[in-house]
Amino acid sequence: MARMPTMATRGNMEVKKIIETGDIFLGIEFGSTRIKAVLTDEKGEVLGIGIHDWENSFLDGIWTYPLDEILSGLSSCYASIKRDIKEKYGVTLKQIKYMGISAMMHGYMAFDKDMNLLAPFQTWRNSNTEEAAKDLSESFKFNIPLRWTIAHLYQRILDREEHVRNINFVTTLSSYIHYLLTGEKNIGIGDASGIFPIDSTAMNYDASMLDIFEEKIVEYKFPWKIREILPKVMVAGQRAGVLSKSGASLLDKDGDLQEGSILCPPEGDAGTGMVATNSIKKGTGNMSAGTSMFAMLVLDKKLNDYYEEIDMVTTPAGDPVAMSHANNGTSDLNAWVGLFREFSKLFGINISDGELFEKLYTNSLNGSPDCGNLMSFGYFSGEGITKLNEGRPLFLRSPKSEFNLANFMRAHLYSSLTAVKVGLDILTEKENVKIKKMMGHGGLFKTKGVGQRYLSAAINAPVEVLETASEGGAWGIALLALYVSQADKYSLDEFLSKKIFDKNTGSEIMADEKDVEGFKTFTQRYLNTVDIERLSVEKFAE
């Protein structure tokens, strides 16, 4: 069986000694709704977990997180794991040998020479870059998605925003936090691949595309060059900086944490998800299922063409990856579960969130394979795959639809996966990419056998979920921090296979043929009715 991610297999006294000597590895990941910290030993076994919940804000037409919430969230999450360690082992965290930062990819953070933020942080959820993304994609002959950092930067240029002239550094959330902790403007290659296209041979930004971009903006006569304002690209295993005194103070408001921890390259949540599911080998894939959804397939060759629906990114080791990404995942689903929670409280019934999700999800298995002609669009924001810049959560049924609770929940679960399926269908149908197996991780897979079965139906391939799956990227970035200490002995693939997942087995499910056909029917209905979603954006004001 897989190692349990929330409990070390050693005795408490032995763990206490390990913590006191500082031979431990910390990963912190900034997700969309939760900042999570995971502390491991040298075997990758989890010693403690810290959590800080947060939410993005929709201010002045953009999705953002204020800087003060980023900083307070960082220290709150660290305080949470510090308490967890103290309660479990009676020891105070003071030394941490290696650590790493991960965060949601893409978006736009632009700073001046004094590292003052020049414009509000725009997250990956913002799709207000249509003109820029289209122009760059045509110029590069490479798909530039709406949420990519270079699309945001170029859109600001096209809009002639005044702050652009004063830019000294443009980066992502993980790289910014890494800078706060170390003073180094570095980034992991996986996260960098969501800023600007990557050359997997050079392990750096694509030089020819940088030149094309420079030519496109020469008329503006900016005092900077694109190569000068992007973070330095680094690959897994490299030392990307050392925790400074000020960085330690940012993390630990009590002042107990010592400076000097070695940091791995900061990575994006896509890359840490690949690590956490041991899916960085060529031909393997993984699906991250949470408030956003993305499926990633590590390629053994380049694609023949480029597609708007497919992003080309990389593993933390730099290998090319095709990604089908959806901005919208389980947010609408979670909102409906919240409604059922409110209903139960109205009758004085107290049900834990875990039980509520488990009962509703499991009951959906009793629904029809095609969801009984029910349809859902859980669009809290725009969706690139269906070419929508805004979204409205929408539920549809006809008078003859099979309207019951099982089909209702099943439709929302299917819908959360369908946009990603549309992208994957392009790879399998137009590029003849074979999906041998998909590894699942994220909140959707916490209820055993439900999200896993539906994903298998969507892709018509086996889906495996490890016991570590719900820990996701925070554990993944902790493993990347651990890998820095092993990089002289193993490739990243070897390290994960031989040192971390050598005894791991997960649960694997292959959907029934009727579920596969049912999902195909649902997907076709989804595509046939997406214009109703488009009309709702036009007619139904926020």
Regions found by a protein language model. Give the residues of each.
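Core alpha/beta catalytic barrel or barrel-like domain that forms the active/cofactor pocket
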Residues: G48-I49, F222-Q238
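Active-site core segments that coordinate phosphate-bearing ligands/cofactors
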Residues: A8, N12-T21, L26-G27, L93, ...
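Short glycine/proline- and acidic residue-enriched helix-loop micro-motifs
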Residues: W63, S137-K141, I229
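Short beta-strand-loop/turn "lid" adjacent to the catalytic site in phosphate-handling enzymes
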Residues: K86-T123, N143-P145, H178-G190, G194-D199, ...
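Carbohydrate-associated surface elements
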Residues: N126
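Gly/Ser-rich phosphate-binding catalytic loop and adjacent alpha/beta segment
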Residues: T129
